[in-house]
Curated annotation (Swiss-Prot):
It comes from Zea mays. This is Tubulin alpha-5 chain. The active site is at E254. It is found in: Cytoplasm, Cytoskeleton. The record marks Y450 as: Involved in polymerization. It is an enzyme of class 3 (hydrolase). Its cofactor is Mg(2+). PANTHER family: TUBULIN. GO terms for cellular component: cytoplasm; microtubule. The gene is TUBA5. The keyword Hydrolase applies. GO terms for biological process: microtubule cytoskeleton organization; mitotic cell cycle. It comes from the Eukaryota. Pfam families: Tubulin (PF00091), Tubulin_C (PF03953).
Amino acid sequence: MREIISIHIGQAGIQVGNACWELYCLEHGIEHDGTMPSDSSVGVAHDAFNTFFSETGSGKHVPRAIFVDLEPTVIDEVRTGSYRQLFHPEQLISGKEDAANNFARGHYTVGKEIVDLCLDRVRKLADNCTGLQGFLVFNAVGGGTGSGLGSLLLERLSVDYGKKSKLGFTIYPSPQVSTAVVEPYNSVLSTHSLLEHTDVAVLLDNEAIYDICRRSLDIERPTYTNLNRLISQIISSLTTSLRFDGAINVDVTEFQTNLVPYPRIHFMLSSYAPVISAEKAYHEQLSVPEITNAVFEPSSMMAKCDPRHGKYMACCLMYRGDVVPKDVNAAVATIKTKRTVQFVDWCPTGFKCGINYQPPSVVPGGDLAKVQRAVCMISNNTAVAEVFSRIDHKFDLMYAKRAFVHWYVGEGMEEGEFSEAREDLAALEKDYEEVGAEGADDEGDEGDDY
């Protein structure tokens, strides 16, 4: 069995987690208390959904997940929420004082006290697996817990489970909307360890998702619940092939193999289609070519950067629902002829497609319409560097004056770590620039950097 353990860190990670598990439960017909009326074989572990749920002797299905936060309020909402009986109390780990938007607190002082407990819980989940495939890590890098404790956990997971793949779903600070003044510091420090300790990281950005909700779903003032439900659709589409059987299944390690040309170039853009409200869906037919075109639209990217400014190195298209390979091939052929979608010249094929016959589910009373077919795209595009250069610029403005740095140093960090992380990101921007440069023959010395 190829199990996956999900780790939700900090407020953002936990709230995205709530949306994801709500959706998984719907898709598999699992009730709020973990029972699954349709599952007649109690205790038999070969069902596909067992990659994400473990089954107890009494026929209860428990998510293979842990939720960690340095302060209790967000986790208390899970403890008292409608899915409180789904999780084992040991899976919900909360500390007493929060990281106060400070990477150093999350990584050194406060986080250090809780990280062993987390790893202990992860080990229990891992012992319960017959063939652990890897980890999905959910966090935001703007705050203190998601960035600090997030990177600490990733570093420790690399030590304990070196060969297992780690996929990150990481919420990056938005260009305009900011929830903390020190976001650029936390993001740069955290990305420094994401670079080394995740195999694939999918960048998400609230502002981009706000815009999608406003534009496509006609929600005037989107809430975090609206955003998270949209994010959960993407994550669900990515993991569909692990949880259901389909025509062309895609494994987690396959993402890595197909999307990551060089170890450091592993930050992905994601998009999903159709994002459409129930009123509109009634009048539209949404064929495979239509939704395929839609995921390549710059406006449907879940991070604020324009793929037309960069080149695609690879992309993964995950279709679900009423889709046959013939339609997919035709749609992909059309995309290849478009001038707006440019591939680097050293990667001519560039498409990996997966098809799953399980149609997309939607949360009842949610914003998305129930549709027959949907597609989720994860793409590796050199334009992602825009996200980093934006954050780097803000970092530089503050760091030039050493503003707010004393908060970090006071928690046991050294100033050198700032410049080290910043240099690492500068190198990353340069890597992206080189990868997108014309002509592959002058890049023979790529290998020395890693």
